[in-house]
Amino acid sequence: IRMLSLNTPLPARHRAQLIASDVSVMRGATPVLNHVDLTITATSRVAIVGENGRGKSTLLHVLAGTLTPDSGVVQRLGTLGIAEQEMPTGDDRTVGQAVAEAIAQPLAALASLDAAAASLSAGVTGAEERYAAALEHAEVLDAWDAERRVQIALEALDAETDPARRLHDLSVGQRYRVRLACLLGADDDFLLLDEPTNHLDRSGLEFLTTQLRSRNGGVVVVTHDRALLSDVAETIVDLDPTPDDQARVYGNGYAGYREGRRAERERWEHEYERQQTELGRLQDSLSSAQNRLVSGW
């Protein structure tokens, strides 16, 4: 187990922020994301929706820092975990290794605390300060409970619990559930999920919903699942096409999203009718002018 460096990033908890400012991403000459602004805090529950190919996963990767936007800035204070929709097939790790890597920081914090306690008992100079710092790190990470959190999630998601099983021997769904359980146990400041319900049964979805609603950290989820949208999302980012090519951000949960979409469509229909009326008026004026030219009046 590696020792925890005092420079290792720690969760920011209530101070955590993830801010995307004027973010744009191009695919060739085609804009995928167009000047997106989004602020996520430790209490945010955000869902990203839209048709296939509209940039939902792209936005998730931009927020995670794994994709650099063509323009705009993403700033983050705090730790982050992401579960992608696609899972690698050649992963030779065991379930136990995946769990250990996911909670490496809490495990290292406990090892550092044990070492600091031994130094304190031996009367080593400066041991009190090192012990106090190690204890603070362990408390911030809730390190004593990390392994239990993962085990609870593995069982609740019906994931593989045998630590000796190789990930490449598991199905795609099983690998995803192991990854998801590890992330839930790691307890990062921000949890980013791409279509998590694809590999969950009803009981797994209920467990995930409870976890996302109660966790002490921000959530961003790409999903088409209406139950998850209704039960978890408080803010919904809609990447579907709009007249001005701008993403729409709706508050007040799924109900607010549906009402916002309805109002947006009514505005669009009203504007379309106004334009058609104006077009008809211009055509009538043009016809009248042409008739006067022909008749000489």
Residue ranges and their predicted role:
Residues 1-270:
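ABC ATP-binding cassette signature C-motif
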Residues 296-297:
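Extended alpha-helical coiled-coil "stalk/arm" regions
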Residues 261-289, 293:
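Intracellular alpha-helical coupling/juxtamembrane segments of multi-pass membrane proteins
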